[in-house]
């Protein structure tokens, strides 16, 4: 190979290296822009304020909190911009309970002046005596039982100061 051929080969190789480097740079810039654009569109349940374990179910986000009283659960959910799930939708309760693997958990029903409410909405709660006995409770609820838990496809009256599993809910964003 003569000297001119060797110089031409060097220039061609240098040109190819510059071409590849510029293509890689352009490609990486394109990936970065795409990633930033998609990140703004992706809706994440994610970790909120240090609270991990959020799960997306039917376009909503849920997380489980173990060993908590009813009042503690309300405060905990509020702190994380969430609420106790709407228990008026039984299909929601069944899906969330099975996905999170929760057997019993707090429901958002409370007793005031001998009537049951979901917030300010009156609801009809009839606890299941058989399920109460399964939990070692008397068939009839005690007057101090002013909260409810969901247990084995039923609702049971419970003392608000007892500790159970709780579930927090937040819309998917």
Swiss-Prot record:
The lineage of its organism: Viruses, Varidnaviria, Bamfordvirae, Nucleocytoviricota, Pokkesviricetes. Keywords: Lectin. It comes from the Viruses. This is Putative C-type lectin protein FPV198. The keyword Membrane does not apply. SUPFAM superfamilies: C-type lectin-like (SSF56436). Residues 50-169 form the C-type lectin domain. It comes from Fowlpox virus (strain NVSL) (FPV). Gene3D superfamilies: Mannose-Binding Protein A, subunit A. Signal peptide: none annotated. GO terms for molecular function: carbohydrate binding. The keyword Nucleotidyltransferase does not apply. InterPro entries: C-type_lectin-like/link_sf, CTDL_fold.
């Amino acid at each position: 190979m003569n000297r001119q051929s060797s110089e031409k080969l060097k220039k061609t190789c240098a040109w190819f290296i510059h071409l590849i480097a510029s293509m890689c740079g352009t490609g990486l810039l394109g990936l970065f822009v795409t990633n930033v654009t998609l990140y703004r569109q992706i809706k994440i349940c994610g970790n909120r304020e240090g609270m991990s374990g959020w799960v997306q179910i039917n376009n909503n986000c849920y997380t489980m909190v173990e060993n908590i009283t009813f009042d503690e659960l309300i405060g905990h959910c509020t702190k994380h911009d969430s609420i106790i799930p709407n228990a008026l939708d039984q299909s929601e309760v069944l899906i969330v309970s099975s996905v999170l693997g929760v057997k019993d958990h707090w429901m958002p029903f409370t007793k005031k002046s001998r009537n049951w409410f979901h917030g300010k909405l009156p609801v009809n709660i009839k606890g299941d005596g058989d399920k109460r006995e399964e939990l070692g409770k008397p068939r009839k609820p005690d007057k101090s039982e002013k909260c409810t838990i969901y247990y084995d496809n039923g609702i049971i009256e419970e003392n608000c100061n007892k500790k159970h599993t709780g579930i927090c809910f937040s819309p998917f964003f």
